[in-house]
Amino acid sequence: MAMHLWLVTLTLVPLLGMDRELMVSAGSLVFPRMPFCEHMAELPNCPQTPNLICGTDGLTYENECHLCLTRMKTMKDIQIMKDGQC
């Protein structure tokens, strides 16, 4: 009986820990979002106002305008991964 209880405990404890990890991971999921570039003219002069954003290409951009400019120049689908530095 004690051996059976021990085996059940060894089986359940790792599962409980895994559930907690999944909940923490799910709570911190980051989904990319599209930058608002439609209003921009061809190759605009971007303001130098620092408002750092992290692109899905892994690069940090000074602001959304700079990310849009890179999208236009490279024709790549770079999105905003998160606000702030990568």
From Swiss-Prot:
Boundaries of every Kazal-like domain copy: 31-86
An example molecular function term from Gene Ontology annotations: serine-type endopeptidase inhibitor activity
GO cellular component: extracellular region
Gene3D superfamilies named among the record's database cross-references: 3.30.60.30
Tissue expression as described in the entry: Expressed in the intestinal tract.
Location in the cell: Secreted
Alphabetically ordered keywords of this record: Disulfide bond, Protease inhibitor, Secreted, Serine protease inhibitor, Signal
SMART domains: KAZAL
Site (Reactive bond): residue numbering on this chain: Q48, T49
GO BP: response to xenobiotic stimulus
The UniProt record lists the keyword Lipid metabolism: no
Entry keyword Cell inner membrane: no
Database matches in InterPro entries: Kazal_dom, Kazal_dom_sf, Spink4-like
Domain of life the protein comes from: Eukaryota
Signal peptide interval: 1-26
Pfam families: Kazal_1
Disulfide bond residue pairs: C37-C68, C46-C65, C54-C86
Protein name listed in UniProt: Serine protease inhibitor Kazal-type 4
Taxonomic source organism: Mus musculus
